[in-house]
Each structure stands twice: as C-alpha cells, then as structure tokens.
C-alpha cells in the first residue's frame, strides 16, 4: 500500500467515525515528517483534526479510540490524531509554537 492509498484510508476512517459521533469536520491536516517528506519506514502519521465546534471529552475519547484502532488495523502504521476546534485553529494558526501554527506551516490539508 503506497502513501496516497494510506492517506485516503486515514481520511475515510476519520470522516466515517466523525459522522458516527456527530463531529463536524472543518479540516483534516497531515503534518510532521509524513507531510514534510522526511519520514522513515518507522514514522507515525500525525493528523490534526479541526472540528467545527468544541466536542466533549467523552466523545473525543470514543472517537480517538475507535478511529485509531481502525486505522492501525487497516494500514499497520502508528498514528497520532490531535483534535482542536475551529476557534482554536483560527486564533493560533499563525503561532508556530502552537499545534495549529505547526500544522498550518508544514501541513497538508487532506
């Protein structure tokens, strides 16, 4: 399975699982070594999920557990998914010290 196929699977699982938990998606951003192109065989996938609105902890936890489990089972690579809401992203997207700024600068919206 190549890079593009894995990315398509990751996006599909995130979108499908978000629908299940009524999570509105604003953006899905791949960042880190996979986005920069300097990844190795052992690199994980770093995903920033920007939601339309803030979601409660319980929903966030259920979403993360289910989506990560499905993704890892399907592509057999480790993955980190970070969730922030649109307001956080918009406020901090120009600050490199924040995850929003890092993802905006080096990330690829998928």
What are these regions (language model features)?
Residues 1-27, 36-41, 51-110:
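Catalytic core of pol beta-like nucleotidyltransferases
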């Amino acid at each position: 399975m190549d890079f593009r196929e894995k990315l398509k699977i990751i996006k599909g699982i995130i979108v499908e699982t978000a629908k299940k938990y009524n999570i509105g998606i604003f953006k899905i951003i791949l960042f880190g070594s996979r986005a920069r192109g300097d990844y190795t065989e052992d690199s994980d996938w770093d995903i920033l999920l920007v939601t339309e609105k803030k979601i409660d902890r319980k929903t966030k936890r259920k979403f993360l557990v289910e989506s990560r489990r499905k993704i890892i089972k399907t592509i057999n690579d480790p993955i980190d998914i970070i969730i922030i809401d649109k307001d956080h992203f918009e406020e901090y997207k120009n600050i490199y010290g924040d995850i929003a700024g890092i993802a905006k600068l080096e990330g690829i919206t998928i």
